[in-house]
């Protein structure tokens, strides 16, 4: 499998789907499935059963569902648009950079 280009806490933008154009932070990455969970993106309603042991009430809750990696791109704040990620080696360490302007991904 290729190197992980999107990581936790990255600022990403949605490229396609019902939330196209929205931005959010990556909460969780499922590398083996090629999917990510982004805060505030792809909200679905889930019918939750009450769990009395944990004092969790039942009802309909909204939560984030996963999004395919192909439908998101990292957000470049200097250019204010979606960008691609490349890798380079600096001081013996492999770091991620934005392809368009060569800035280091923070």
From Swiss-Prot:
Q: Which GO terms describe its molecular function?
A: rRNA binding; structural constituent of ribosome
Please give the coiled-coil regions recorded for this protein.
none
Q: Which Gene3D superfamilies match?
A: 2.30.30.30
- A Gene Ontology CC term for this entry? ribonucleoprotein complex
**One Pfam family this chain carries?**
KOW
Ribonucleoprotein keyword on record: yes
Q: Which family does it belong to?
A: Belongs to the universal ribosomal protein uL24 family.
Known function: One of two assembly initiator proteins, it binds directly to the 5'-end of the 23S rRNA, where it nucleates assembly of the 50S subunit. One of the proteins that surrounds the polypeptide exit tunnel on the outside of the subunit.
Which PANTHER family is this protein grouped with?
A: MITOCHONDRIAL RIBOSOMAL PROTEIN L24 (PTHR12903)
Record's protein name: Large ribosomal subunit protein uL24
Organism name = Blochmanniella pennsylvanica (strain BPEN)
Q: Which gene encodes it?
A: rplX
């Amino acid at each position: 499998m290729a190197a992980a280009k999107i990581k936790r806490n990255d600022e990403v933008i949605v490229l396609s789907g019902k939330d196209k154009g929205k931005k959010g932070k990556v909460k969780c990455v499922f590398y083996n499935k090629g999917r990510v969970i982004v805060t505030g993106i792809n909200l679905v309603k889930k019918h939750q059963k009450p769990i009395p042991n944990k004092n969790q009430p039942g009802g309909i809750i909204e939560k984030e569902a996963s999004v395919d990696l192909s439908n998101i791109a990292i957000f470049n704040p200097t250019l204010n648009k979606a960008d691609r990620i490349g890798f380079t080696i600096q001081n013996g360490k492999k770091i991620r950079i934005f392809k368009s302007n060569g800035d280091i991904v923070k």
